[in-house]
């Protein structure tokens, strides 16, 4: 049986070392730009290079997130950044936006691409599409049921990655506008979500002003907003 890769996030160099110390085979991290890991300390270009060298000395891997949904102005700086990541032998980049994917293939053709969970890949046909585009791995959307993962693999024979711990967004993998609405400048699609779905809410119907329906939660979660944490550790053997 093929060995599964254990991948952990690294918000800064110290956490990177801890991830490897406790058994991670690879770590993913964000740079100071173009990453949805906005509230991590993140890594400067030089720190990314040092992280790659450190990981490779241990026989481990580094993946860098380049998974924002960019505006046109971002494309002024992305080519040089992607070329730099290729030059320092980053093991792969995580990309969600087709425009960045296309650019990466053009300016850094030797850089492996993993399709980020932010791309909301939920089915075998989409996985096959990314495979045909040249992706080496697809990180499935968190909404994909565990029972579907085997079927997706059998129909694509694509390298797949899935989250086994962490928050479940109420929207498809971060496509939420609540954070923008309530804060005006904290964009969930740029890694700045304040998780407004975890606030306490009441529901009001327009024709019944002053009558508040509390958004309650039971063992199955809430029925209006359903943010929860996932935990699949019971499905894995040591």
Where are these regions (language model features)?
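Active-site pocket-lining/capping segments in soluble small-molecule metabolic enzymes
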Residues: 1-121, 148-238
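Acidic, glycine-enriched active-site microenvironments
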Residues: 112, 134, 138-140
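Conserved nucleotide-cofactor-binding alpha/beta core module
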Residues: 124-125
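Active-site loop and adjoining helix of the penicillin-binding protein/serine DD-peptidase-beta-lactamase fold
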Residues: 143
